[in-house]
Amino acid sequence: MLGFLSARQTGLEDPLRLRRAESTRRVLGLELNKDRDVERIHGGGINTLDIEPVEGRYMLSGGSDGVIVLYDLENSSRQSYYTCKAVCSIGRDHPDVHRYSVETVQWYPHDTGMFTSSSFDKTLKVWDTNTLQTADVFNFEETVYSHHMSPVSTKHCLVAVGTRGPKVQLCDLKSGSCSHILQGHRQEILAVSWSPRYDYILATASADSRVKLWDVRRASGCLITLDQHNGKKSQAVESANTAHNGKVNGLCFTSDGLHLLTVGTDNRMRLWNSSNGENTLVNYGKVCNNSKKGLKFTVSCGCSSEFVFVPYGSTIAVYTVYSGEQITMLKGHYKTVDCCVFQSNFQELYSGSRDCNILAWVPSLYEPVPDDDETTTKSQLNPAFEDAWSSSDEEG
């Protein structure tokens, strides 16, 4: 650490390298914070979480009870032990509350004055944060599993919506209507995600075992249907390609948008090149997944080696994205975890579970001390630690 600081001060090292190394160290030290609670409001399981990208201060949660809660994550009391309080909530007595389970909540990417929610009640709602009133409501014929707004687009205000039907619907917030329908899947759409790199690139995952990449400006169908065998097993038409051997119920782009992670009920996670659709063949081992709906997982941002956090039963498994190595299992929930979200400013993780709790995972403030009867040599250290701190640190 001192070597990095000295090199940065003298201009020998790029400041970004120090930041990435420290971010990596903090992610590797994530543990359940016993001094921080998140106020318990939900009477049912937590299905979805989202932290606004403007300040990284406010978090939305949506539950199986139809309730939406807005939390302030900042420690305004400056005390070591504190509770993240609910600023407001859309409870059962609210006139516009969702009638059934809320499956997805998302902040408007450019402003905290608006957020969206979708539910099993077949609606997508657009909310005014200040008044907690609906600004618009989109009604669908089928149950809504997932929706997503582009985190980078300044050219369109399209919300991609996945429902129990096989069609992906694009809702335009400007016009207040469904402007596009993407056809190609054969069963329900369990997850949708816009690329964080390109305005018009959308990924969709379905119960038909397929993942498709779309350029929504094109009228001629999808760009690519991902093939787990990279075209080697069969030279059949692209429509026969499958990404998993079960339902695909989770999607997540890496922060740079160059790769796409998918999870399926075949207990596998796969990493894809998002530009050509190639399966990178990274082996993550068994990733337990028996969810019958969308699984919300997340990736780190700004680390030397990026990490992916995946709900795994009542735990959260942490893997190195590009090597597939399992770093740790975060244990603290009593029931199945359905969602997690990463706070990149402070390298924190928040998770929601069917035990009705939201837990905060924060970097430990101390170095782990080995047992007296153990000797830890450099060769025994986790390779991710070696990536985080270079030899120049030891010399400093």
From Swiss-Prot:
State the source organism's domain of life: Eukaryota
Gene Ontology terms: biological process: DNA damage response; double-strand break repair via classical nonhomologous end joining; positive regulation of DNA repair; proteasome-mediated ubiquitin-dependent protein catabolic process; protein autoubiquitination; protein polyubiquitination; regulation of transcription-coupled nucleotide-excision repair; response to auditory stimulus
Q: Which residues carry this modification: Phosphoserine?
A: 390-392
> WD repeat ranges?
33-73, 88-129, 133-173, 177-216, 235-274, 281-321, 325-363
The protein's annotated pathway = Protein modification; protein ubiquitination
User: Which segments carry the region annotation Disordered?
Assistant: 371-396
Q: Which Pfam families match?
A: WD40
**Which Gene Ontology molecular function entries are recorded, alphabetically?**
ubiquitin-like ligase-substrate adaptor activity
Q: How does it assemble?
A: Part of the CSA complex (also named DCX(ERCC8) complex), a DCX E3 ubiquitin-protein ligase complex containing ERCC8, RBX1, DDB1 and CUL4A; the CSA complex interacts with RNA polymerase II; upon UV irradiation it interacts with the COP9 signalosome and preferentially with the hyperphosphorylated form of RNA polymerase II. Interacts with ERCC6/CSB (via CIM motif); promoting recruitment to lesion-stalled RNA polymerase II (Pol II). Interacts with KIAA1530/UVSSA. Interacts with a subunit of RNA polymerase II TFIIH.
Disease linkage: Cockayne syndrome A: A rare disorder characterized by cutaneous sensitivity to sunlight, abnormal and slow growth, cachectic dwarfism, progeroid appearance, progressive pigmentary retinopathy and sensorineural deafness. There is delayed neural development and severe progressive neurologic degeneration resulting in intellectual disability. UV-sensitive syndrome 2: An autosomal recessive disorder characterized by cutaneous photosensitivity and mild freckling in the absence of neurological abnormalities or skin tumors.
Task: Tell me what this protein is called.
Answer: DNA excision repair protein ERCC-8
Q: Which organism is it from?
A: Homo sapiens
